[in-house]
């Protein structure tokens, strides 16, 4: 039986996808795992490389148009479901999922029809459970990379620095240049601009 850790990155930004990662830790597990928000960028990148090289992992990505259609909660549950489903495809036929540990107070169980694994929510799990810590690192690094790439096509918004969050720089660019296809139109600052 394997335990899978799941976490997401990108629920709060005004632009870009929400990304979930699912990780089955290797033995011995990489040392220094912690909540991705507590790690320096250099340490996160180092741990991401170790996790990707030595552990089994997958990501689920839900784009802004789907976030607008489902709402951010539904999109997060979908991203988690996609990540766990993709990871389970990597497992050997004789490996069963014992439990999926999800950062937060809710899981996709009963909220996504495709979710078929036993799940347990853990508030603050990204700092408490190493497999969730690993997932938080993979999710954040993956999403940050996507936003750096998106910044090349949309340079006015500073996404390589703010990852799509509503910083003063991003809000000023949004007012001046308007929303891009990567903006979440259901999020208040973007929706309010569309009403003007």
Curated annotation (Swiss-Prot):
Disulfide bonds: none annotated. Its EC number is 3.1.26.4. GO terms for cellular component: cytoplasm; ribonuclease H2 complex. It holds the Pfam family RNase_HII. GO terms for molecular function: manganese ion binding; RNA binding; RNA-DNA hybrid ribonuclease activity. Residues 1-196 form the RNase H type-2 domain. It is an enzyme of class 3 (hydrolase). Its cofactor is Mn(2+); Mg(2+). Its main location: cytoplasm. Gene3D superfamilies: Ribonuclease H-like superfamily/Ribonuclease H. It is found in: Cytoplasm. This is Ribonuclease HII. It comes from Novosphingobium aromaticivorans (strain ATCC 700278 / DSM 12444 / CCUG 56034 / CIP 105152 / NBRC 16084 / F199). The lineage of its organism: Bacteria, Pseudomonadati, Pseudomonadota, Alphaproteobacteria, Sphingomonadales.
């Amino acid at each position: 039986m394997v335990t899978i850790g799941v976490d997401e990155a990108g629920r709060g930004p005004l632009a870009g996808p929400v990304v979930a990662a699912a990780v089955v830790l290797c033995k011995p597990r990489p040392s220094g795992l912690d909540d991705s928000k507590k790690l320096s960028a250099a340490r996160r990148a180092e741990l991401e490389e170790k996790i990707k090289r030595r552990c089994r992992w997958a990501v689920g990505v839900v784009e802004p148009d789907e976030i607008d259609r489902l709402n951010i909660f539904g999109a997060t549950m979908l991203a988690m479901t996609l990540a766990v489903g993709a990871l389970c495809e990597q497992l050997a036929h004789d490996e069963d999922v014992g439990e999926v540990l999800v950062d937060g107070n809710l899981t996709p169980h009963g909220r996504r029809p495709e979710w078929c694994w036993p799940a347990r929510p853990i508030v603050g799990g990204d700092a408490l459970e190493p497999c969730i810590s690993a997932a938080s690192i993979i999710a954040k690094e993956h999403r940050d990379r996507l936003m750096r790439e998106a910044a090349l096509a949309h340079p006015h918004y500073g996404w390589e620095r703010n990852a799509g969050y509503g910083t003063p720089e991003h809000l000023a660019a949004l007012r001046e240049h308007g929303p891009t296809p990567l903006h979440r139109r259901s999020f208040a600052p973007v929706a309010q601009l569309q009403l003007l």
